[in-house]
């Protein structure tokens, strides 16, 4: 979008996905969630984090993993995508650079042996966990049981959309639910954080002066309900329209409806 870059004096297009971790805007929610995840790592077996699409789960995970002490923890990232119980064991071993046997009994035995002997605590992050099969979700309760030692040997971070919380509310997930002492639900940004996020995004794209007026930022918050992905879409479209129409300052009347 060279026209936009040239018109507004930007070095790159803001409101995209290619932001580096150090440039991520630290909202109150991100700071609080990151602190909770960090504190939960030492003692918790299972952590639950949910939020609607575009609420910042991926950014939170990136920040969380980026700040992990790799001398103490081994992060493993998996996606739920219809993952079955055998695949869950297999994928964890593979990500830990261990060849997984085909037999479910053998793969379970090797999993427990590997975790017991690990010098660094594995942190298993399962994104889109709402898409896992029931048998895989149910298996997690057994996968954190190490009767020989009361210490937490492994930590599962289950990340998903709000339906994940609904799924584990069913009675057959009660034993799993009881093991989850730390759970976080993400929502939209506040008005203050939405305005700060917009200004920050413009600044890291190379421009010191503001592009969006206060009324525009307020209207963007109202339309997006503070959901980051929606904020990005509205702002991106407004920048394109603003450059085409030569609007030095984007006002609320310049905002384009975005589905």
Functional labels for PLM-detected ranges:
Residues 2-4, 35, 62, 175, ...:
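C-terminal alpha-helical "lid" subdomain
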Residues 78-81, 168, 181-194:
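Conserved AAA+ ATPase "SRH/arginine-finger" region at the nucleotide-binding site
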Residues 1-43, 256:
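A short, basic N-terminal segment
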Residues 65-67, 164-179:
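Short regulatory helix/loop adjacent to the ATP-binding pocket of P-loop NTPases
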Residues 10-17, 73-75, 83-102:
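Conserved NTP-binding/hydrolysis module of P-loop NTPases
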Residues 5, 84-91, 99-139, 147-154, ...:
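Mid-core helix/loop region of P-loop NTP-binding domains shared across ATPases and GTPases
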Residues 47, 70-80:
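Conserved catalytic segments around the Walker B and adjacent sensor/switch elements
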Residues 42-63:
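Walker A/P-loop nucleotide-binding motif
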């Amino acid at each position: 979008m060279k026209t936009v870059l040239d018109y507004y004096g930007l070095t790159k297009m803001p409101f995209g996905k290619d932001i580096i971790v150090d440039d991520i805007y630290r909202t109150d929610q991100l700071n609080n969630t990151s602190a909770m995840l960090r504190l939960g790592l030492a003692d918790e077996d299972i952590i639950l984090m949910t939020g609607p699409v575009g609420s910042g789960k991926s950014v939170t995970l990136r920040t969380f993993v980026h700040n992990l002490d790799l001398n103490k923890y081994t992060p493993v990232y998996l996606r739920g995508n219809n993952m079955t119980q055998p695949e869950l064991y297999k994928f964890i071993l593979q990500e830990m650079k261990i060849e997984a046997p085909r037999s479910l009994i053998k793969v379970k035995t090797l999993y427990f042996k590997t975790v017991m002997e690990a010098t660094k605590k594995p942190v298993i992050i399962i994104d889109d966990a709402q898409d896992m099969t029931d048998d895989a979700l149910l298996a997690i309760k057994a996968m954190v049981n190490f009767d020989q030692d009361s210490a937490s040997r492994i930590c599962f971070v289950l990340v998903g959309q709000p339906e994940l919380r609904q799924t584990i509310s069913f009675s057959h997930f009660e034993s799993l639910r009881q093991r989850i002492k730390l759970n976080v639900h993400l929502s939209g940004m506040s008005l203050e954080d939405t305005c700060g996020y917009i200004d920050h995004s413009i600044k890291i794209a190379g421009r010191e002066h503001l592009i969006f007026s206060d009324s525009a930022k307020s209207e963007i918050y109202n339309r997006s309900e503070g959901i980051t992905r929606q904020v990005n879409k509205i702002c991106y479209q407004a920048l394109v329209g603003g450059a085409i129409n030569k609007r030095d300052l984007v006002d609320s009347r310049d905002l384009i409806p975005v589905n």
